[in-house]
């Protein structure tokens, strides 16, 4: 089973580049399932029904999110009703949407879990480690289970990877928009990367126009951030997963230009 996980898609330019790039890459690599973090896929921050549909129409099967999930109120009803878009499972139960979904491929099923870190991000959220424990007790949980861990701190992400090792198929980190070079199969068979990266404009600061970020750093005043344009990239990781064991055989990291 070939499962592709794509880094945070940034704005309309990221969405458009994904639409141009993903279909051919799926065919070339024989990819079965695509998971993408879409929490920044709308211009102006957050995710909207339109940007989510753009990603799904482009070949993404499941969209995960993060700390920007609730930025756009028009998205609340959409995520409540969708089985293809999830938000961090350790959000309060009153939050719209759900934190886990199951994709039925006919011959097999795949569970996708979304969690968010506490360190430097939101210390008031429920513990992602304990939330994982609860979710893994779900009756009839599929053998293949992928986790998007949306978190800031490398240490928290790596600790979570080892905590989940042998219990889920793969853990891919999101949020920082910077692809790390530590993709691996952990000792008990879980595929892992600290951060898969970003899908969006290359000449930018995490997708934002560089001059705006520089202005904020120098002036220490509020600055409205706009996404950059120009050439884009698609950062992703491919997990080769054994359908019998649910564990990862190999990982391969890409940055498509």
Enumerate the predicted regions with their spans.
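Acidic, metal/ion-coordinating pockets
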Residues: 1-257
């Amino acid at each position: 089973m070939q499962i592709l996980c794509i880094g945070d898609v940034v704005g309309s330019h990221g969405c458009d580049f994904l639409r141009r790039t993903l279909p051919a890459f799926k065919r070339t690599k024989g990819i079965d399932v695509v998971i993408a973090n879409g929490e920044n896929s709308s211009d102006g921050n957050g995710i909207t029904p339109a940007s989510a549909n753009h990603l799904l129409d482009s070949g993404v099967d499941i969209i995960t999110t993060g700390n920007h999930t609730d930025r756009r109120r028009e998205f609340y009803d959409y995520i409540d009703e969708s089985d293809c878009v999830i938000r961090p499972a350790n959000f309060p139960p009153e939050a719209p949407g759900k934190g886990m979904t199951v994709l039925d491929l006919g011959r097999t099923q795949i569970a996708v879990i979304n969690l968010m870190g506490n360190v430097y991000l939101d210390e008031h959220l429920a513990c992602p480690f304990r939330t994982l424990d609860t979710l893994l007790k779900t009756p009839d949980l599929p053998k293949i289970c992928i986790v998007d861990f949306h978190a800031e701190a490398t240490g928290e992400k790596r600790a979570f990877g080892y905590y989940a090792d042998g219990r889920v198929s793969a853990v891919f980190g999101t949020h920082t928009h910077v692809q790390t070079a530590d993709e691996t199969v952990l000792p008990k068979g879980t595929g892992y990367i600290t951060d898969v990266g970003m899908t969006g404009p290359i000449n930018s600061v995490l997708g934002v126009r560089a001059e705006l970020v520089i202005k904020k750093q120098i002036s220490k005043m509020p600055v409205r951030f706009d996404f950059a344009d120009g050439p884009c990239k698609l950062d992703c990781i491919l997990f080769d997963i054994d359908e019998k064991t649910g564990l990862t055989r190999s990982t391969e990291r890409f940055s498509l230009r």
